[in-house]
Amino acid sequence: MRTTFATVALAFLSTVGALPYAPNHRHHRRDDDGVLTVYETILETVYVTAVPGANSSSSYTSYSTGLASVTESSDDGASTALPTTSTESVVVTTSAPAASSSATSYPATFVSTPLYTMDNVTAPVWSNTSVPVSTPETSATSSSEFFTSYPATSSESSSSYPASSTEVASSYSASSTEVTSSYPASSEVATSTSSYVAPVSSSVASSSEISAGSATSYVPTSSSSIALSSVVASASVSAANKGVSTPAVSSAAASSSAVVSSVVSSATSVAASSTISSATSSSASASPTSSSVSGKRGLAWIPGTDLGYSDNFVNKGINWYYNWGSYSSGLSSSFEYVLNQHDANSLSSASSVFTGGATVIGFNEPDLSAAGNPIDAATAASYYLQYLTPLRESGAIGYLGSPAISNVGEDWLSEFMSACSDCKIDFIACHWYGIDFSNLQDYINSLANYGLPIWLTEFACTNWDDSNLPSLDEVKTLMTSALGFLDGHGSVERYSWFAPATELGAGVGNNNALISSSGGLSEVGEIYIS
């Protein structure tokens, strides 16, 4: 009988600082029996214990852990503190509990397989297929396949984890010497120059700079830990949230979100000697200018994506990128890196992160509860006035974007802009997903009424119906029409298609992928650089 995995136990290490983000409304993970699990929180290390012999209708339980405590959160909503020690991260498996029960089975031995680690530079993404069973005798794969680099805090030593497949297949000891990687001894700033042309409608600083770079080193935002506690829940996403209903794991702590679409297949190292590149300019304007193709196109770079994919876009007129975070993913210096204040969780550290005339995109889809970080418009405006606007006025931020709304967020944006008339907003950030080109036209034309440049930082051709997604020809047709429209629209300053990856999840569909399965440009990718 075919073995499936419906029981998944997650042990989460406490995470430090602001984490990067990948879009979070496409988190389907399926096997032939249906949805196994969906989760939204980016975490530094994920451990999965798969229990064979169950099907996807069985209960499953998630666990989160720091170094001193473990919380069990089962499918019926119960939460129970589990015993542990200061040197262990406990991973337990669970059987399907009796009705209205969170009974948990604690086998004498079990396999804890860390699938990957991540850091503020490179976040992992998940596979759309079942997690393979691993045993102490045959671990799922070598560490180099599943691991990206993990930044050590200043108190941790600089050794790599895991040391061997034996460690991968055994329960994990959370001593600081095991889960570390290359950490830069110092963070030097190398500068390069770029040019800018002020948009007529933008606020112009007398001397402003824009942050960009090809960072390959990690810089921690703070030393404080965020305790994460996730619970498996069933989330019904409304039509306003793109009409998808999926089970979801919601986080009770401040965190970011992640696309869970493909297994990280190669390690991305953080070199100890690498430096953050921060491109600056002393031009009289804060508005960026690009070259080639339209001069507007960029990359919505999903953290954890193979860096080699970016080579397909070098010297092809794609000259900027962002990654939903505040630290570069390490792409070529030919791409300007644009920062994102993804949510409100790390605002207190904004003054140390946004410096030197940085370009900053605002909160990510705060109008959507499904985005994992909903903020009402009035509160968002107050955050801008308290944390971001002073940085814009001082020149630390040289070009400040509005929150990036979804294409059902125009009312939210209207309320925000009314409450934030003194916020020094330089450009409107937005997302759009759909299949009707005329709807995209109407959306952009409506946003143009604010009289500010527009950045369309996510868009793709999808109806969110994974049983009847648009065909490749339909995607190509919409992209071709959209590129011509956006290139010719006087208010559109920048845009980025979702996404330069091979796997985009069931919601968006892989026909939108700019990268083919072989790692080169897909047919859609070829159109994007033409």
UniProtKB/Swiss-Prot annotation:
One of its GO terms (cellular component) is external side of cell wall. Residues 69-90 are annotated as: Disordered. The keyword Signal applies. InterPro entries: ASL1 (IPR053183), Asl1_glyco_hydro_catalytic (IPR024655), Glycoside_hydrolase_SF (IPR017853). Residues 1-18 form the signal peptide. Its main location: endoplasmic reticulum. GO terms for molecular function: hydrolase activity, hydrolyzing O-glycosyl compounds. One of its GO terms (biological process) is fungal-type cell wall polysaccharide metabolic process. Keywords: Cell wall, Endoplasmic reticulum, Glycoprotein, Golgi apparatus, Secreted, Signal. Disulfide bonds: none annotated. The keyword Repeat does not apply. It comes from the Eukaryota. Gene3D superfamilies: Glycosidases. Glycans are attached at N55, N120, N128. It is found in: Endoplasmic reticulum; Golgi apparatus; Secreted, Cell wall. PANTHER family: ALKALI-SENSITIVE LINKAGE PROTEIN 1. This is Alkali-sensitive linkage protein 1. It comes from Schizosaccharomyces pombe (strain 972 / ATCC 24843).
